[in-house]
Amino acid sequence: MSLRFNSFGTHVTIFDQHTRLLEREDPDIATEVVADLTDAGIEIKPETQLTQVKDNGEKVTLYYQQGDQSNTAEFDAVLVAVGRRPNINSLGLENTDIALTSRGAIQVDDHLRTTVQNVWALGDVNGGPMFTYVSLDDFRIIVDQLFDKGDRSTADRMVIPTASFLNPPLANVGLNERQAKSAGYDLQTFKLSVKAIPKARVLEDQRGLYKVSVDQKTHLILGATLYAAEAHETINLIALAMKAKLPYERLRDMIYTHPTMSEALNDLFKTPVVKS
C-alpha cells in the first residue's frame, strides 16, 4: 500500500517496531527492497514504537519513541497494517457446536471439516494462509469430498508460493536461507543479480535479486526468494519443481524461451555462491 499511495504523489512514512523492515526476509533481500523504497521517496523509521495517535480532524498526530528520543509527526491519514484475524463475529457460531481455535479461527481438520458434521469452513475464517488462491484450493478440497473421491486435503499443499506486489514484486516459496540454516540443512545457496538477465534490460528494470536455497545432499530446492520484475510469475515455476520434488538441475538445464525472466534460472543454478 505504501508504494500505491507513493505512486499517487503522496509522501509516505513507514513506522516499524523491528530493527529493519522485512525482518523475516534474508538481510540481502531486505536491503535491496529498502533501498528501492527509499529511492522512491518513502521514508522508513525502524525500531519505532507508537505511543499515541491523536485525530485532529483534518490531520492526525503520531507520538512515537525511536531509541531514547520522543517525537511527534503530523499526517493527513494513518493506515494501520499490523496483521489480520478471521472475521467470524457475524456468523452466529455461538449458536452452534462449531469449535474455534485459540486464535479465533474456525477449527477444521485437513479436509476442512468443522466439529459439526456436514459443515466445512473455507477461506480466511479457518485460520489457514490468508490468500485468495488458498481459498480457491479450499474450495477444490471441499468439492472433491462432495462430488469426487475426497482425496484432496491441506496436507497436499506444503508448497505455497506468495507474492508482495511491490515495485518490483517480491515473491517467496519455501524456506529462505536463514530459515534453511536454522533447520539444519546442509545448504547450498544460489544467487543472481537481476542486472545479468537480458529480459530485465528489455523491461528497463534491472533492480533486484534471485536467491534459491538447495539441500546439498538431495539437490532438492528448499525455497526461493525472487525480487524482480515478473517475480510473481517466475516463482510458480520454482514452486512446481519443489512440489514435484525435482532436483534443481532440472531447472538449470531446461530450455526456456528468450527473452524471459525465467530463462535466468539457467544462469542462477550454475554455481552456488555459498556453501555452509
Residue ranges and their predicted role:
Residues 52, 97, 111, 211-213:
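Short, surface-exposed charged micro-motifs
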Residues 56, 102, 216-218:
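Short acidic-glycine loop/turn motifs at beta-strand connectors
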Residues 72-149:
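FAD-site-proximal beta/loop scaffold in flavoenzymes
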Residues 165-276:
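Flexible, glycine-rich terminal cap/loop adjacent to redox cofactors
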